[in-house]
Amino acid sequence: MIKIRSLETAVYRYPLKTPVQTSFGIMRDRPMVLVKLFDDEGVSGIGEIWCNFPAVGAEHRANLVNSIFSPLLSSQTFESPEDAFDYLTEKTWVLGLQTGEFGPLAQSIAGIDIALNDLFARKLSKPLWEFYGGKKSEVPIYASGINPKGAEKMAENALDKGFKALKLKI
């Protein structure tokens, strides 16, 4: 069981040398929103919130977490990450209906859920993959963000960096 004391958000943007064309539009930077939860003993867990689009999506998700989810979580006690997920989903359902922002709310809950799972795993002194029931400490990875234009060069660069699998945008 954990009692949430507080949370923090941080927005990061990594400028891209070459803009990336995605199915959503052109990305000129790689945004990231991290949420860090603290329990009443000072143990923390970190999660990431999806925020690629629109361009102001990162700041918007951070604002949602700070203004909506932080007050909902503060001083709440949870038996499990699933209990917290259900609680947040239930508490924000009507807000989603009123605002039409089911996506940003769900993405924020997902990032908080990751942070909660990380926090519960840390309380048990387990790596997250083991907390989830995984059996391997390594998993295969692939390079993504390879666009049709200039794909051959981008693929060669990824292979040179050691990637053995690629995801090509078409």
Question: Which positions does each model-derived feature cover?
Answer:
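Structured beta-strand/loop patches that form or line metal/cofactor-binding pockets in enzymes
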Residues: 1-46, 50-54
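N-terminal amphipathic alpha-helix/helix-capping segment at the start of soluble metabolic enzymes
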Residues: 1-11, 122-138
